[in-house]
Amino acid sequence: MSEKAVRRKLVIIGDGACGKTSLLYVFTLGKFPEQYHPTVFENYVTDCRVDGIKVSLTLWDTAGQEEYERLRPFSYSKADIILIGFAVDNFESLINARTKWADEALRYCPDAPIVLVGLKKDLRQEAHFKENATDEMVPIEDAKQVARAIGAKKYMECSALTGEGVDDVFEVATRTSLLMKKEPGANCCIIL
């Protein structure tokens, strides 16, 4: 008899072009996307095992662009975990993680735990080796401060390009979703 998988829904939000889709692409398909295409809505399903528990993880990729703000709230329904992503080379995306994305997640899905994820971690190393680097990287301590301020369960960084930390992000997110007590009717709901 096959083992029944626990189902979990993960929703990733953040500014457009911050690296959300690349993260999901690398995690589910094992390779970095060759071209950037703005996301409207994409769903992926993958099976994984965390702490000996088989999990069917549904991944919801959302559009960060303003023109999709009216559609995005539908993705929050019954979310078990929210990833808020920002690009480590774009301080404004961290500010938006705190002011826009955390507020939106808490409004539509107040009981879902949040993990704050710094994306494009490889750019930190690249900037370190550039003599005249003009792009200012988000200090890790600033990101940790934002994570605390929004009540995130964890702050993590990863690079979809190199693969560093990608599996760790989803392991922590899945584990966090499993640790949350599920009360009947405690899932996120949307009233329109």
UniProtKB/Swiss-Prot annotation:
Keywords associated with the record:
Cell membrane, GTP-binding, Hydrolase, Lipoprotein, Membrane, Methylation, Nucleotide-binding, Palmitate, Prenylation
One Pfam family per UniProt: Ras
Cite the positions of S-geranylgeranyl cysteine lipidation: C189
Binding-site residues, GTP: 14-21, 61-65, 119-122
Under Gene Ontology molecular function, one entry of this record is: GTPase activity
Q: Which residues form the propeptide?
A: 190-192
What GO biological process terms does the UniProt entry carry, in alphabetical order? actin filament organization; establishment of cell polarity; fungal-type cell wall organization; microtubule-based process; regulation of actin cytoskeleton organization; signal transduction; small GTPase-mediated signal transduction
Q: Which family does it belong to?
A: Belongs to the small GTPase superfamily. Rho family.
- Matching InterPro entries: P-loop_NTPase, Small_GTP-bd, Small_GTPase, Small_GTPase_Rho
**Where in the cell?**
Cell membrane
Key word Hydrolase present = yes
Give the lipid-moiety residues, type S-palmitoyl cysteine. Answer: C188
Q: What is this protein called?
A: GTP-binding protein RHO2
What residues bear Cysteine methyl ester in this entry? C189
The record's note on quaternary structure and interaction partners says: Interacts with BEM4.
Topology in membrane: Lipid-anchor
Encoding gene per record: RHO2
Reactions this protein catalyses: GTP + H2O = GDP + phosphate + H(+)
Under CDD domains, the record lists: Rho2 (cd04129)
- Cite the EC number: 3.6.5.2
Q: Which GO terms describe its cellular component?
A: cell periphery; cytosol; membrane; plasma membrane
Origin organism is Saccharomyces cerevisiae (strain ATCC 204508 / S288c) (Baker's yeast)
The UniProt annotation puts motif Effector region at 36-44
